[in-house]
């Protein structure tokens, strides 16, 4: 979770809450649980559905289109970092049309309250509802209301200033908005402003109070249409009590008309989603310092105190379903301190010490296994991309049919393609075997030849693991394979093989594979997994149809042993200083071809203004050149970026355009426009640029989603190029992935939250019941000295938790003492 700007995050020295939205498909290697499925009735016989995911009014993701299906499976997973004022999550299911506009099948909307009602989140089928234009509202309106009295009675003065980010109702992507104010039986209207979603009225409407009971104030926004009825854009309403005690003054979110009953949409199908919202109050760094120091002491302390350390107690209190999240946060926390190696060595030492059978080493989902797995994903993702991406891309592009299992062979496939006779089962097997080895050969060549490219931190972690296993199992019968299996079990079974099986989850591809390619990837992943197991399970009764591959697999095993020997042949001096980040600032986090345009090039026709450029983004620069091989590059320092936002389609009559607003040394703002191929690429670039520029000061709170053309802004129609931005920026909305920066405070907060869950158990088990000493000693074999150290560690943990409790209570007290929540900010 990234920190928002200090000006919005901190309140009297304490920060506001941060939020993280997780969409989790429950994926396991070799198995995907159905996450999103829509089942519309067979109207035309088939559909080409895809799903849009929106946070409030911002599209954050688009799934792949599943062609010719009434029951598609997407299996998409998204982690979204949210702004503080997040209100709603929506899923729109659409039918893609190659000609004309895509048809909306239906949608589901989940309010923030609905998601947080159950701490476990939502995991269920939800019926799609019809998309009602009167309910599809967005944006905000700025009002200032006064209640006045004179000799003729009471008067309501409503100053309608402006609105922003209204829903587009016209085919041009804009609207013709006007406001209508109701008070009692009276109503007045503002003027209509044509072709804008960001109207500025600055009009004052006065209404006299009529006899009778006090009336609420309602302000409606409408899109004026010359032909047909006007389109509803949204409304706000204020009770008589609010008008009397605290007249509205500021920005207010537009709401739809209340509906008598919700459309169940039973005939539209249903969507299955799994959503979890994590909202944490993240305190200043000094509040977490005692907790962090306790965890560091656990890692740096003597080995004989492993079982009595605070980190050991944390491991005991963590349930299986929480271990992955905790492992990720702990790895990041220790990475930021340069202690990832000692942390992994500590967990490895404990795991190896309690393992009796070397064949079961690291096979469970223990904290040690999960931490090493997350460490590889965090530190080794660029390495994984370098090794596997070329061959994965080749498999996707060539779309070869491969099958060894006779029960799954489609012998008529070749005949349908080539109009020749169907091949025999043996011919199909030989052809598939040649294709599989043709892919596996380069994959294994890339892996065994990648020693020099493997991150030094990973090599040191594997060396420590290698040493601990040799010390625990020194007998000759163990030495042959155990020292290799411990490493290959992580590197091959938990890293390479899962990445081959599901490339999208490892950012190797933008979309999931089609069924045929997915089967090819499964066969390749099975082969790599067998090699990672050093061929120990070959020919043991399972999947005997893989036997034709056995000679290749056994030949590769000897190469893997040599590769692992070279991989762990590294020392601290060669590895350099301990890693304190996921990757160096100069590392490329995203690259690819985009269309680039500078702001308003004079005398150049607009359709020629966008030029194809190859773009690199690192933590330091955003660079452009004509091609990847081109030596001349133009670069923008990431530290100069002040906003990264979408651009309305109507600005250039082009879709998927974003803007990067930078500030030079003289304080002048400059805008670079970039066009992406599709909405997913747009979201990925937006997210990457926002995360890279997150630490920058002086971020813009608002900018223009249009372009300055023909002496005015296309969005708000203002004539001054220097006019203040008309739309709020969305710097807090980013997609979570492997390139997320370290955030020590948020990671420490997660550890604190996990300890809170086990605090009562900790008190009962190690502090409050002195009669448990004898039973605990009998169960664990621990001596009284160990029990005393455990009790002391628990006491220190509970003391730290109490201090953090008081800090959080102080924050909550400040929240309670705040004036009632006011209108939306600028």
Residue ranges of model-derived segments:
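Eukaryotic beta-sheet cores, primarily in C2 and C2-like/PH beta-sandwich modules
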Residues: 1, 51, 58, 75-112, ...
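Acidic, S/T/P/G-rich intrinsically disordered/coiled linkers that flank
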Residues: 1-73, 79-178, 182, 579-581
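Long, low-complexity intrinsically disordered regulatory regions
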Residues: 1-36, 42, 117-120, 124-151, ...
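Extended alpha-helical scaffold/tether regions of large eukaryotic proteins
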Residues: 2-3, 130-132, 214, 235-611, ...
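Polybasic phosphoinositide-binding surfaces of eukaryotic membrane-targeting domains
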Residues: 40-42, 49-51, 78-80, 173, ...
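Pleckstrin homology
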Residues: 53, 111-123, 133-135, 181, ...
């Amino acid at each position: 979770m990234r920190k928002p700007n200090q000006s919005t995050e901190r309140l009297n020295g304490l920060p506001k809450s941060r939020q993280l939205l997780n969409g989790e498909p429950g994926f396991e290697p070799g198995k995907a649980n159905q996450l999103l499925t829509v089942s519309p009735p067979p109207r035309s016989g088939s559909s080409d559905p895809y799903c849009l995911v929106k946070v409030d009014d911002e599209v954050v993701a688009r799934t792949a289109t599943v062609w010719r299906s009434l029951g598609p499976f997407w299996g998409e997973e998204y982690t979204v970092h949210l702004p503080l004022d997040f209100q709603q999550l929506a899923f729109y299911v659409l039918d893609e049309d190659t000609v004309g506009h895509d048809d909306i099948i239906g949608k589901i909307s989940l309010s923030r309250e609905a998601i947080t009602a159950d701490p476990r989140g939502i995991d269920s089928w939800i019926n799609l509802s019809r998309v009602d234009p009167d309910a599809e509202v967005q944006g905000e309106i700025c009002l200032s209301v006064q209640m006045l009295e004179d000799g003729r009675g009471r008067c309501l003065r409503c100053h309608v200033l402006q609105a922003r980010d209204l829903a587009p109702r016209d085919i041009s992507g804009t609207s013709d908005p006007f406001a209508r104010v109701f008070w009692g039986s009276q109503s007045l209207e503002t003027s209509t402003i044509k072709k804008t979603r960001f109207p500025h009225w600055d009009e004052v409407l006065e209404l006299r109070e009529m006899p009778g009971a006090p009336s609420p104030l309602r302000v409606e926004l409408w899109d004026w249409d010359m032909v047909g009825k006007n389109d509803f854009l949204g409304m706000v309403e204020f009770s008589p009590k609010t008008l009397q005690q605290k007249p509205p003054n500021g920005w207010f979110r537009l709401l739809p008309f209340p509906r008598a009953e919700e459309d169940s949409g039973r005939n539209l199908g249903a969507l299955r989603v799994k959503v979890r919202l994590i909202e944490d109050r993240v305190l200043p760094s000094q509040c977490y310092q005692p907790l962090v120091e306790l965890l560091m002491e656990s890692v740096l302390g003597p080995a004989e105190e492993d079982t009595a350390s605070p980190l050991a107690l944390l491991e005991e209190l963590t349930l299986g379903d929480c271990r992955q999240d905790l492992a990720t946060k702990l790895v990041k926390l220790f990475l930021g301190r340069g202690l990832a190696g000692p942390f992994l060595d500590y967990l490895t030492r404990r795991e190896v010490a309690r393992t009796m059978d070397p064949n079961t080493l690291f096979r469970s989902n223990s904290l040690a296994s999960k931490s090493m797995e997350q460490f590889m994903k965090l530190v080794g993702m660029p390495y994984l991309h370098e090794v596997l991406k070329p061959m994965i891309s080749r498999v996707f592009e060539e779309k070869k049919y491969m099958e060894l299992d006779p029960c799954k062979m489609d012998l008529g496939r070749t005949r349908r393609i080539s109009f020749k006779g169907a091949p025999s089962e043996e011919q199909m097997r030989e052809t598939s075997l040649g294709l599989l080895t043709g892919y596996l050969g380069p994959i294994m060549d890339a892996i065994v030849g990648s020693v020099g490219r493997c991150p030094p931190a990973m090599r040191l972690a594997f060396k420590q693991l290698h040493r601990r296993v040799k010390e625990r199992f020194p007998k000759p019968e163990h030495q042959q394979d155990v020292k290799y299996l411990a490493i290959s079990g992580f590197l091959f079974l938990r890293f390479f093989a899962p990445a081959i099986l599901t490339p999208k989850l490892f950012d190797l591809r933008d979309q999931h594979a089609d069924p045929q390619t997915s089967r090819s990837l499964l066969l390749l992943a099975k082969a790599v997994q067998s090699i990672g197991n050093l061929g120990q399970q070959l020919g043991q009764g399972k999947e005997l149809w893989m036997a034709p591959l056995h000679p290749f697999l056994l030949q590769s095993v000897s190469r893997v042993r040599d590769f692992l020997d070279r991989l762990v042949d590294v020392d601290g001096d060669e590895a350099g200083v301990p890693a304190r980040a996921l990757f160096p600032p100069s590392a490329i986090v995203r690259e690819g071809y985009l269309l680039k345009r500078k702001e308003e090039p004079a005398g150049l026709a607009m359709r020629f203004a966008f030029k194809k450029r190859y773009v690199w983004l690192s933590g330091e620069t955003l660079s452009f050149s004509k091609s990847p091989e081109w030596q001349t590059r133009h670069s923008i320092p990431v530290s100069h970026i002040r906003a990264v936002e979408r651009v309305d389609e109507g600005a250039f009559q082009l879709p998927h355009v974003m803007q990067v607003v930078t500030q030079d040394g003289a304080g002048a703002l400059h805008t670079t426009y970039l066009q992406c191929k599709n909405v997913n690429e747009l979201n990925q670039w937006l997210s990457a640029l926002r995360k890279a520029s997150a630490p920058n000061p002086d971020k813009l709170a608002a900018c223009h989603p249009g372009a300055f053309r023909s002496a005015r802004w296309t969005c708000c129609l203002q004539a001054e190029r220097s006019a203040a931005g008309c739309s709020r920026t969305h710097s807090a909305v980013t997609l979570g992935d492997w390139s997320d920066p370290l955030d020590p405070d948020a990671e420490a907060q997660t550890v604190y939250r996990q300890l809170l869950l086990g605090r009562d158990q900790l008190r009962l088990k190690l502090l409050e019941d002195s009669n448990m000493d004898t039973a605990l000693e009998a169960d664990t074999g621990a001596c009284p000295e160990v029990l005393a150290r455990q009790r002391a560690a628990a006491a220190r943990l509970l003391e730290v938790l109490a201090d953090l409790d008081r800090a959080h209570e102080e924050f909550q007290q400040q929240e309670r003492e705040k004036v009632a929540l006011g209108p939306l900010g600028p």
